[in-house]
Amino acid sequence: MARYEDLPYRTCVGMMLINRAGLVFIGRRAGGIEHVDDTHVWQMPQGGVDPGEDTWEAAKRELYEETNVRSVEKIAEVPDWLIYDIPRTVAGRAWKGRYRGQRQKWFAIRFTGQDSEIDIIAPPGHKSEFTSWRWEPMLNLPDLIVPFKRPVYERVVKEFSQLAIAV
């Protein structure tokens, strides 16, 4: 097995889905290796980018796979790739030990549909990523995520804070 330091980062997208009230969609993770405690189980949708796939197309695909949502408009993008390392204690189990963390392109996305469009229990053709969901004020997000992802969430909130307004 490769040394932790030599492992690459998994290329991913993250989506901050903002409703008309300026609140952000968060889902309660369905367990997994990232489960630290019952306080830090909430996160925004995120997922891998397929080889050759455009990041915006990947964001729309992943959002649909995790939430069933298609009624969206892209409103902003973090210009940089944001990176986090997973703890060494779980690195061998996460993604079959192939990655040391993720390199993510983040998008702010306006949700233009109705809440009834959201379906996390039976997403189209995929296993559920979340067990429940809610709309949350943007500034609360860093306190709800697992600690090793917190710096990424702090940066995303800083980049998109002006978007947390009702429209």
From Swiss-Prot:
Principal EC category: hydrolase
PROSITE patterns: NUDIX, NUDIX_BOX
Keywords tagged on the record: Hydrolase
Cysteine pairings via disulfide bonds: none
EC number(s) given by UniProt: 3.6.1.-
Reported cofactor(s): a divalent metal cation
Biological role stated in the UniProt entry: Accelerates the degradation of transcripts by removing pyrophosphate from the 5'-end of triphosphorylated RNA, leading to a more labile monophosphorylated state that can stimulate subsequent ribonuclease cleavage.
Protein name (record): RNA pyrophosphohydrolase
Matches recorded under Pfam families: NUDIX
Domain called Nudix hydrolase: residue spans: 8-158
Coiled coil region boundaries: none
Record bears the keyword Hydrolase: yes
Family that this chain belongs to: Belongs to the Nudix hydrolase family. RppH subfamily.
